[in-house]
Curated annotation (Swiss-Prot):
Name of the protein this chain belongs to: OCIA domain-containing protein 1
GO biological process, one term: regulation of stem cell differentiation
Listed Pfam families: OCIA
Quaternary context: Interacts with OCIAD2. Interacts with STAT3.
Ranges for region Disordered: 113-150, 171-198, 217-247
Length: 247
């Protein structure tokens, strides 16, 4: 044994490449025949019946007064519209049938492209089933193919865990090896800055009174008085009759 597991199934089919179908693709004679057949069948078996049915329904709705007719052309515009819608609905409803016709062609690149696209859409379920088979094969090989060297390598890769020492006494409730690494709380000595002292109403009142007294003393200070008040008055003499004169 070379130590490698072969995951390929003996009867697995190699997927064939999808042919490129572009705008410049030239269809084969068989494909042209199928195109003409699909065109005729979709017209006679789908478009004509649906167009006729839609026109009859439209005419019935107009006659009952559910749909209003044109004042000049009558019901002709609505009937033409119903016919066109029925024609395209018939063409679209025949697309699946036409695709099946192309898939049944053996030597058709277009049919091969359609088959490959359908296989790819349905491939996830098969992919998961094959994957489960591969997983079972891998587990089988791993169960029978283990060696002492592989066991030693696995032991080396596993992490080594050392037991945490616990105190032998019953009074201690925490391991001795863990408390060393517990994050300590904030130091009580390092307190926050002192909070701002609350000012009472009496203190505020005293401060206002002091400031008022200071301003009052500034007003009554002689150095601040106006010049006229500080100028000395002249002496005036008064006689016995109350008359005054200056010397």
């Amino acid at each position: 044994m070379n130590g490698r597991a072969d995951f390929r199934e003996p009867n697995a089919e190699v997927p064939r490449p999808i042919p490129h179908i572009g705008a410049d693709y030239i269809p084969t004679e068989e494909e042209r025949r199928v195109f003409a057949e699909c065109n005729d069948e979709s017209f006679w078996f789908r478009s004509v019946p649906l167009a006729a049915t839609s026109m009859l329904i439209t005419q019935g709705l107009i006659s009952k007064g559910i749909l209003s007719s044109h004042p000049k052309y009558g019901s002709i515009p609505k009937l033409i519209f119903a016919c066109i819608m029925g024609y395209f609905a018939g063409k679209l409803s025949y697309v699946k049938t036409c695709q099946e016709k192309f898939k049944n062609l053996e030597n058709s690149p277009l049919g091969e492209a359609l088959r490959s696209g359908q296989a790819r859409r349905s491939s996830p379920t098969g992919h998961y089933s094959q994957r489960s088979k591969y997983d079972s094969n891998v587990s089988g090989h791993s169960s029978f193919g283990t060696s002492p060297a592989a066991d030693n390598l696995e032991k080396e890769m596993l992490p080594h865990y050392e037991p945490i020492p616990f105190s032998a006494s019953l009074n201690e409730s925490t391991p001795t090896g863990i408390t060393d690494h517990i994050a300590q709380g904030p130091d009580p000595n390092t307190e926050e800055s002192p909070k701002r002292k609350n000012i009472t109403y009496e203190e505020l009142r005293n401060k206002n009174r002091e400031s008022y007294e200071v301003t009052l003393t500034h007003k009554t200070d002689p150095s601040v008085r106006p010049m006229q008040e500080r100028m000395p008055k002249k002496e005036v003499k008064v006689n016995k009759y109350g008359d005054t004169w200056d010397e």
